[in-house]
Amino acid sequence: MMMERYTGLIDARVTAWCGALPDNALHAPMAYLMGLPAKRVRPALVLMGCELFGGSAEHAMDEAIGIELFHNFTLMHDDIMDKAPLRRGRPTVHEKWGVNTAILSGDAMMVKAYQALGRYPEVHAVFSRCALEVCEGQQLDMDFERRADVGVDEYMEMIRLKTGVLLACALRIGSIVAGAGPEDQDRIAAFGEHLGLAFQLRDDVLDAFGDTAKTGKQQGGDVRAGKKTFLLIRGLERAAENRGILRDELAKSPDARDVPRMLGLLEALGVRDEAEAL
């Protein structure tokens, strides 16, 4: 299959990239996180975008690695902000090396992402715009944790920024490397944004109801953290008589929240089915 071929190419390049890193405290977390089992969706989209417009996957490998580096940089810092204990079933970088090293190593990954994406000025410009939008999306995500009145439309814009624009960027960069024109770039990027929305909604469901052994993440981690996911927003909108239960739990500290109770209520309200149907 196409994705399996892309994943094989990317995994081989990631292994070589990790093996070439200096053996020190700054680079060890990069090699650790990049070396964990991963789907490699974003770099695969770079290769796909390149081949769709007549280019060679091998010709876009630097850009694919750059996108994967940036994605893992965001994961490293997101895990710090979320106080997440696990990433892909393994201890997060800040749990293993400490917060300070995780921050610094993540910063260095961002620099390396820019280096990998430096061949084409147009790619550099597209990536810079995308990186800023991803940061804007992450800030909205954190802002929403402190608000009780987040609507579905606001949430969809947040996940467009946090997730959709990076998938769009990956496909657009691949098309640029292949020499695609502006209209084709715009079309493939629009597809990437919609794919990103679906990807994030599915991730919301897996975070809440997925098997930790399969997802590699703590079940209900977003609910425990009070994140305004689609599930929680729609649950608060639907829970007329039970709205107080969700609000009471959200008023507690994260460690004190009855997460199984909250997840049970959300499923009973039908928001899981609604998210999966979108």
Residue ranges and their predicted role:
Residues 1-278:
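All-alpha prenyltransferase/terpene-synthase fold signal
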